[in-house]
Amino acid sequence: MIQQRQAPLSVLFVELNEAEQHFLRRFVAEGKLPAFARMLEEGAFVRTRIPGFDPTQPKAWRVISPWIVWPSLYTGLTPAEHGLIGFGQDTSSIHGRCVWDVLDAHGISVGVLGSLMSFPPRTSGAARYYVPESLADDPSCFPDEARALQEFCVFGARNYSVDFARHAREALTLLWRTRKSGARLSTIARTMAQVPLEKLAGAARVPERAMLHSYLVWDAFRTLYGQHRPRYASVHLNHVAYMQHRYWRAAEPQRFRDALSATDQRFFQAVDDRKRYEERFHDWIEKSFRWMDARLAELFHLVDNNTVVIVGTALGVRPFDPVHEIHNPVVRLVHEGELFAALQLPAHVVL
């Protein structure tokens, strides 16, 4: 009897940085994440641990940052073995050791988009596309059509804290070029409208800034993956991590002290004032998970029956109360009035 040979398996690895199980389980239980619910029901949930990690040690979080954990996940090396602790480092210790390097060396097609510490782009001949993280040293990537996206992402990362008006023309030019990388016109328009909408709608729209990168990256991923169909593909997204870091207190105020941190005191006179302000951000963690859930649903229709979809988070997070758990020194300007007067800016004050 002749048996039909089963097609080889492919893997699509969604790197959802730092997505916390606490919120995942909560939103699934509330019926808000049907795609994640399907994965939990029909697939497998695996929780790993870092050998030697002791969460009770002072500043234990310093040894489990994303730039440490993701390389361990990619390579199987312990943090001590690969020695990476932050972006900008020489990553030669993991070259040839990452899962995509190994597969590439054996002639199995791969595609990398945004994986942390994946710079520089490299191939032994089987990589179909390779776009490193947005914190890469430069926008090097391949194929050529992916470069427009990487130029915009690297530019955005390099100018994150700079006033938008100073680089608006260059930013808009780079953004428009991302069409070559698969960015949809609707996504480009949404990105261009962000700052004007903030002016109209106020602070409640500001959190979406953290989503824009994922919107663009996902468009490019769908295009590159759809064109090349590599046997192993990865895509890295950071929007959930940002929302958790920034808005956990807004999402679950009952888990935090009814007090003002040193930073809070710069902006609020009373706890009630802070709570009223943060209320407008209470659902952004949920929004970030729900957006990802919709993208997973898209993937289920995009992949074939021989493709395994994996969602990895590298590490979870926990809430730190800024009132007593975060040491964030506040630098105060002394004699500010005299300084601004000398600069001929008498109406200016430090908030």
Enumerate the language-model features and the residues they cover.
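Membrane-interface soluble catalytic domains
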Residues: M1-P8, H22, I85-T91, G96-R97, ...
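Short secondary-structure boundary/capping segments
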Residues: F27-G31, A126-Y130, W248-P253, P322-R332
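Short, hydrophobic/amphipathic alpha-helical packing segments
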Residues: G96, S214-R222, I285-F300
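Short, hydrophobic/glycine-enriched beta-strand segments
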Residues: S10-N17
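Short, structured active-site-proximal loop/turn typified by the sulfatase FGly-forming signature C/S-X-P-X-R
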Residues: L24-V69, S109-L113
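Metal-dependent active-site segment of extracytoplasmic phospho-/sulfohydrolases and closely related
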Residues: F13, A35, K287-H327
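His/Asp/Glu-rich, glycine-adjacent segments
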Residues: S72-F268, D272-K275
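A structural signal for short, well-ordered beta-strand segments and their strand-loop junctions
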Residues: E15, R47-R49, S109-S115, Y232-H236, ...
